[in-house]
Amino acid sequence: SVLSSMGCGRVVVIDYCTGVTASLAMRPWREWLRTYRQQQRGTHYLSAPGSQDITAEVCIDQLALGVGEADAIRSQAQWLQLWGIDELVDEGRRWWEEKASAPDLRAMTGRSRVREAEALCDPAGLGAFTVLEWVAGP
């Protein structure tokens, strides 16, 4: 497996996930098998072959069978918070507040950072991903 060949390190998977494969049978298939074209939801997966991306939710139970249980399973927001997104947002907010009356590039970057973090942590939008981590070594 990749983990045993690494020695030490971390494998991070970021994707749409569901815990148990059987739960997909209880949901409409268009929720867990999706198509995208030009950053928009696509049409039926067979209606325009080769013109859209097809993606399916990753079933965590299937990954566990192949590589073992993940060491950590978090929402995208939790993972970003773990790695300091709140501190980056606070810094951006300070930059904006310092120069809001006459914004420079740094202030605009700070303001943008706040809005981007909101989007990346929104579980109904760009933040709908799950983050799985496997750690190898000490």
What does each model-found stretch correspond to?
Residues S1-P138:
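Long, Lys/Arg- and hydrophobic-enriched amphipathic alpha-helices
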